[in-house]
Amino acid sequence: TTPVIQFNSVRKIVKTSSDGLGGKIKIDSVIMSVDFQDGDGDLGLTVAQIKANPKYKDFSNFIVDVLIQKNGKFVPVTFSPRLGGLVNFPFLPNQKPGPIEGTIDYSTPFVYAFYKGYSPLFTEKNDTLKFQIKIVDNAFNVSNTVETAPIIIFQD
């Protein structure tokens, strides 16, 4: 069956890390949480499943599109590679197929030193972003798309 998701929350963790050259760099990590349901529980793959089946070679089951506010409107930002990827959904305890539901978190870091290089749409500070999220089950059924609340990164 096709998975269904709902927006749960979006939050930011601000931290400073070493740049490896004796300096410090600022990192804003954005954590997006979505609630999910899937009637047959075929979300998430084991390493063995990925290795055994070539159709999962470049499989992404958590897809994130980024929007930035410009002149009062949100416009898409192209990331290469795209945000998201292969997320480990919690497996059913008995490994038998069946309905599954829960909450999954996805975190992506924005490193201040490289931030403007991600996209020409980005500015130095105080960009307002939103994220559109969808998930894909192991049969390649694509969920509905949810949108996060806006969040400001590299805020003064």
Predicted regions and their residues:
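Non-catalytic macromolecular-recognition regions in eukaryotic signaling proteins
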Residues: T1-S18, G23-D156
